[in-house]
């Protein structure tokens, strides 16, 4: 089984959290002539980074499990609920000894890695009185009570931890984007306060003009609508719009031939629409906003099409969606520039948080400055004492010389001048 087939079943585990734009893969036009496209084995595709701090461990466990024929067969037949509930994890008891041995080794390596992280954290905090075993409990993707062998409970915990973490990922991205937009507006207003009235009016006019230029773009098709998909068919795939066929379209954009449109493949379909609104060469277009728009489009299409909420679109789900009225006559799509991303109350609350953080940073900076000044004072005092000591030694040597006493060395020994 290829990795992407495994990824399809573990979609909620390994769905890629892509932050950068994904271009649609160019398609050979002749491929559309074959409507019953057979899946073909292609070169191994590296699994995407999930963004989880245990990403490498997760991928290695999946790679080892896919080498066991029994587990692979069970995985192919399992539905998402069976995987999520932990019933599939019980099949681990039936895998080969070789696979179990490799899983045991992976777990020991992961436990060792986590212990090194904990030690580094404790060393940084200079706190050696904490219990390492208790600290291991904060890592919920493995059974810390048994650090030596990989059991069904480990697989169950790994699945549940990754599921929860990835489901939270999109929500976190939306929250971070909102904070980003509020920070931009906060900094803009703070900058205006530093300007004269004339300069402020010029900046306000410049801002309004950039906003107008950004909003002046071609109509954006409703994501997942017939018009949107036909535009991809014609302009990206280079095909005749009159020959548009949903089934062929699905197979063309199922890039890895695994029978699903995953989140990467879906997001690639929106590049043409996003190009209408965002251009990296234009000062008025923000590429971070473009990625938020891409995320919103993907989430919308998934909510409309993905009936079993497994974060994958099957051919059946895709074709069923093309039969709906909304596919032919969708509502207009509102881009980010047509929406209020935050209220004045939310901005004021965010600014109050920033003010508190800045106050704390200023307090720390003042404390560091005082420490620096105290260290400098101590340094100057030591330098002054050093100079006084050197002067005293010189005066003593000079006095001894005047009295005809041989000068002494650093350890007090007598120094005799050679006779000439």
Curated annotation (Swiss-Prot):
Residues 387-396 have a biased composition (Low complexity). Residues 213-420 are annotated as: Binds to necdin. It is a peripheral membrane protein. PROSITE patterns: EF_HAND_1 (PS00018), EF_HAND_2 (PS50222). It holds the Pfam family EF-hand_7. Ca(2+) 1 binds at residues 254, 256, 258, 265. InterPro entries: EF-hand-dom_pair (IPR011992), EF_Hand_1_Ca_BS (IPR018247), EF_hand_dom (IPR002048), Nucleobindin (IPR040250). GO terms for molecular function: calcium ion binding; DNA binding; G-protein alpha-subunit binding; guanyl-nucleotide exchange factor activity; tumor necrosis factor receptor binding. It is found in: Golgi apparatus; Endoplasmic reticulum; Nucleus envelope; Membrane. Residues 1-24 form the signal peptide. A motif (GBA) lies at residues 304-334. PANTHER family: NUCLEOBINDIN, NUCLEOBINDIN-2. The GBA (G-alpha binding and activating) motif mediates binding to the alpha subunits of guanine nucleotide-binding proteins (G proteins). Interacts (via GBA motif) with guanine nucleotide-binding protein G(i) alpha subunit GNAI3. Preferentially interacts with inactive rather than active GNAI3. Interaction with GNAI3 is inhibited when NUCB2 binds calcium, probably due to a conformational change which renders the GBA motif inaccessible. Binds to the postmitotic growth suppressor NDN; coexpression abolishes NUCB2 secretion. Interacts with MC4R. This is Nucleobindin-2. It comes from Rattus norvegicus (Rat).
